[in-house]
Amino acid sequence: GTAANALSLAILTDPWGAVFCHRHAHIEEDECGAPEFYTGGAKLVLVDGAHAKMSPETLRKVIARVGSGGVHGVQRGAVSITNATENGTVYSAQQVWALAEVSKSYNLPVHMDGARFTNALVRAGCTPAEMTWKAGVDVLSFGGTKNGCMGVEAVVIFDPAKAWEFELRRKRGGHLFSKHRYLSAQMDAYLTDGLWLRLARAA
């Protein structure tokens, strides 16, 4: 999951960029600086919010403060949303869209840390499309490990133009395994006949 998030952010953010996320986001609290490392130095800029969720109003205020100092400060880079959050709360598709609307008003791409994405879908009662690209998400870290798979995550990139850069960064970062088919086989079974959703409903 850490690699999925960090490599995803690396294709969205320059080394001098800012990644806006909640102060209790997994990329801030539990990834040992991996996003900063894989992006080449991008800064995580923290956003407050009750129950580990950002609000559009607070996100807008924080984004507005960053990147206005010219060469002396980090530039606006991307927004990362954790869904479900580290506190177990869930953004609805409408709430994701509201955050993405703020992001797009500053021309910022949106990343979703979906380590518990399936749990969020089940709780919100929406489709994967409604929670992601239809709501303005550009890249999804799609978790399998926290829902029954063994060491398997996927990254879903909705802009095909970004996919090749991700492939190169994955290889360079040591995450292209020679026996990757054994991981892919898990994901294939996971997504067949709704197994992933049944597991999430039981969790």
Each language-model region and where it sits:
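Conserved PLP-enzyme active-site core in the AAT-like
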Residues: 1-202
